[in-house]
Amino acid sequence: DGDDYKFGHFRWSVPL
């Protein structure tokens, strides 16, 4: 869905 996920100090976007 292209949503940005924030996990601790990590951040990435899911191209689904």
Curated annotation (Swiss-Prot):
One of its GO terms (molecular function) is hormone activity. GO terms for cellular component: extracellular region. It is found in: Secreted. Keywords: Hormone, Secreted. Belongs to the POMC family. This is Melanotropin beta. It comes from Squalus acanthias (Spiny dogfish).
